[in-house]
Structure formats: structure tokens, C-alpha cells
Amino acid sequence: MANLSPDEAIELAYDIFLEMASDNLEPADILLFNLQFEERGAVEMVETSENWEQEIGVLIDPDAFAEVWIGLINQNDEMDDIFARFLISNDAENREYHVIWKS
């Protein structure tokens, strides 16, 4: 089983985000993302949260998944506007993923 590298997980999340954002985000959020991403945008891999079971209804092994956030950072380099949180299987053969979109 080949694991996704952090760069691969980030690239996959960003590709999915670009493909699905228009169907899952409000037009104002899409405009904000497009206007601000070059200056303040971030795509970051974070420690996999253990509360995904509450979000998706399935118990997961945090070590088997990568969590990637896509959003905008503030002047303190903190991501304070998250457009999507991705849970992506580390198994490169299994492209399973879940997304929580900004509501």
C-alpha cells in the first residue's frame, strides 16, 4: 500500500476544491476566495482531528487519513476563514475523501 505524501494530499485536496467549490460555496465566498487567495490563501495539512466521526458518521483511524484545510490566513498567519476541510485517505490506491464546506 503506497501512502500519499503530504504534498500529494495537499494537491489532491486543492484539485477537488477547485472542481467542487462552485457547487458547495456561496457566491460571495467564491468571490472572496478568488480575490484574496493569491495574497492570503493557504492550503495546509493539519493533524487529523478525531471528531470526524461526528461530522461524517463513520469511525476513522486518524493515522489512515490526512486532513487538509483550504482558507485564508490573517496577519498573524492563522487560518481564520476556512472554506473547506478535507479528510483524505493516505492510501494512494484508495481515493476516499470527505469534505466539510464552509456554511
Curated annotation (Swiss-Prot):
NCBIfam families: PRK05094.1. InterPro entries: dsDNA_mimic_put, Put_dsDNA_mimic_sf. Belongs to the putative dsDNA mimic protein family. Gene3D superfamilies: dsDNA mimic, putative (3.10.450.140). May act as a double-stranded DNA (dsDNA) mimic. Probably regulates the activity of a dsDNA-binding protein. It comes from Glaesserella parasuis serovar 5 (strain SH0165) (Haemophilus parasuis). Coiled coil: none annotated. It holds the Pfam family DUF440. HAMAP family: Put_dsDNA_mimic (MF_00680). This is Putative double-stranded DNA mimic protein HAPS_1002.
